[in-house]
Amino acid sequence: MSALSTRLVRLLNMVPYFQANPRITRAEAAAELGVTAKQLEEDLNQLWMCGLPGYSPGDLIDFEFCGDTIEVTFSAGIDRPLKLTSPEATGLLVALRALADIPGVVDPQAARSAIAKIAAAAGAVAAVAEQAPTESPAAAAVRAAVRNSRALTIDYYAASHDTLTTRIVDPIRVLLIGGHSYLEAWSREAEGVRLFRFDRIVDAAELGEPAVPPESARQAPPDTSLFDGDLSLPSATLRVAPSASWMLEYYPIRELRQLPDGSCEVAMTYASEDWMTRLLLGFGSDVRVLAPESLAQRVRDAATAALDAYQAAAPP
């Protein structure tokens, strides 16, 4: 837990603590709370600035100091159990359900347990414990390795090259980018930080050794530039039929214009022409390449080759 989070937890517990220990001395309070006298003074000054909306003197948390003792005179309700409003509970449930369905971000069982408790506390109709989504053994192994700081061996499918490789990595953290979970890890083979998408990790197993990514890699902020528009990458102009419009939510696509028939023209960046060709073949006639011509020709050639192979394999 970060220092900021630790202080927040301490501040939230200080008012109930002082109410349970009226007229406790500063020295005793500092010792029991595990802080210095200076930190206790800073915490009390911070609490003095917290309270109910309006934030006038009568709305803020207040203390009475008698000699060296401390007593709460107005708690601003911070001593009462937290109660969520209906919109707050609904928003929290929606967020938890979304997180529970994304591999690797949270423990699915813990998330579903929290969902059931919040739904019951909020008075949801027929609140029942929801079954946690099935987590793949690979995702569970990766999450455990991150939690335990253990090195991993993974079998990873690289969509851009259509290959399955085995790699040894030192996990750093799990990231959520564009609705997908990624393992950020130090690749010993590449000697650099790499991102591995959870749904492309075919198998994973902890090694009997600690994860030892370089300290510079561990401390550096996540590099998500791959998911930003990179002007150095080639771009294709595509015409997307309404039936394939869902692809706009899953790929680095910028919509150019809507057409009268409901289709749209888009610009899509890509790093590998091989990968782009395979992707477009999967959409059939729903996605047509308008530019560049080299990519359009490559897709046509690949489609013709596939059709010829199919006809050759067909029984006479």
Curated annotation (Swiss-Prot):
Residues 131-211 form the WYL domain. Disruption phenotype: Cells lacking this gene are not severely sensitized to RNI and display no accumulation of the proteasome substrates Mpa, FabD and PanB. It comes from the Bacteria. PROSITE patterns: WYL. GO terms for cellular component: peptidoglycan-based cell wall. Transmembrane segments: none annotated. It holds the Pfam family WYL. Belongs to the PafC family. Part of the pafABC operon, but PafC does not seem to be involved in pupylation or substrate degradation. Appears to play at least a small role in resistance to reactive nitrogen intermediates (RNI) in vitro. Interacts with PafB; with which it probably forms a heterocomplex. This is Protein PafC. It comes from Mycobacterium tuberculosis (strain ATCC 25618 / H37Rv). The lineage of its organism: Bacteria, Bacillati, Actinomycetota, Actinomycetes, Mycobacteriales.
